[in-house]
Amino acid sequence: MTRSKKTLTVIDQINASDKVRKKIIEAASTLYVQKGFTATSIEEISEKAGVSLPVTYHYVKKKSEIMKMIMEDALYAFQENLIKEIKGVDDPEEKLAIAVVLYFKVMDGQGEKVLLMYQKSSSLDKASKSKVMQLEVQVSQIFSGIIEEGIQSGIFNAVDVDLMAYNIILMAHMWVLKRWHFKKRLSFDNYIDQQLAIILNALKL
């Protein structure tokens, strides 16, 4: 009887994939900040998340995979919201402004995780590093696509598209990394407005 109950609980947890995945990510992020990447075990992550160990191992075979999950979570949050926000928007300039503001907000909301990625990326194994890099390229391609669209439409200058896309990514990360400096004189909204102005001034004919 007890065994059947436990098996059902594990299956139920696995079926509730998004919710469980987020619990694991949040627990891992908190523990990595508190204890460090090396000192944190998967067992501790499982306990902190309130998820059974078999279910945790269903999602994560090794700790480095959680870093990949953190990056995926940020990317999917950005992609999902962007699709909704730019639906019906044809103007590349407006589309880019929406994408920039949204990405900055996603990065700010996941600031602790962004810091972890910068601090602990050297701890990742080769496969996880490669996956994280691929995910970053996917983000840059979203911006590249919109910028390219603006160039083709004659709205934007013929800039180095890849370089501009990565400039945008790093501007968003800079708020997280250097917030201690900027927050003394800029609100987050001011920071976004000024960076967006820099981006559009560089792009517009």
Each model region followed by its residue ranges:
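Short amphipathic alpha-helical elements of helix-turn-helix/winged-helix folds
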Residues: 27-31, 106, 171
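Amphipathic alpha-helical packing segments from all-alpha helical-bundle domains
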Residues: 76-79, 83-84, 127-153, 162-166, ...
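Hydrophobic alpha-helical connector segments
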Residues: 69, 83-112, 164-168
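Helix-turn-helix
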Residues: 19, 23, 27, 31-65, ...
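Short coil/turn segments at alpha/beta junctions that flank glycine-rich nucleotide-binding fingerprints
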Residues: 34-38, 89, 110, 153
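N-terminal intrinsically disordered/low-complexity leader segments
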Residues: 1-19
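Hydrophobic/aromatic-rich alpha-helical bundle segments in the mid-to-C-terminal region
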Residues: 114-119, 129, 151-197
